[in-house]
Amino acid sequence: MKMESNEIHQIIEQNQRLLQNLNTQRHCECEVRQLISEIIGEKISDSVEIRLPFFTDYGRNIKFGKDIFINSNVTMVDLGGIVIEDHVFIGPGAYLISVNHMIDPKRRKELSLKKSV
C-alpha cells in the first residue's frame, strides 16, 4: 500500500485531534474503544482494555486481537505496522516503534518502513 505524503499527513492531523479528545476528556471504557477504533480505522473487540493516556503517530497501521490489556502512557509509532495479537499485556510507558529514518543525512527525510512489529 503506497500512500502519498499529503494523505498520510491528513490522517495524522485527524488522529491528533481524536487523541487529544481521548487523552484530555473523561471517557468510559466503551468510549475509549470507540475513539481508538476511529483512530485505527476498524472496530476493536470489547475484550480490549486500554488505559489512558495512549499515543500513536499514525494509527491506521495498528491491528488489535482479543483479550488485550494496554497500560497507561503507551506510545505506538506505527507507519511500518504494529500487530498486537490475542492475550497480550503491555506494561506502562512502553514504546512500540516500527519506523525509522535513514542514517545517511542526504536521505534522512525518507522513512524506513519495516515489517509489522
Question: What are the language-model segments listed below?
Answer:
Residues M1-S47:
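Terminal amphipathic alpha-helical/low-complexity segments used for targeting or macromolecular assembly
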Residues F54-F64, F69-V117:
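Flexible, glycine/small-residue-enriched loop-and-beta-strand segment within the central core
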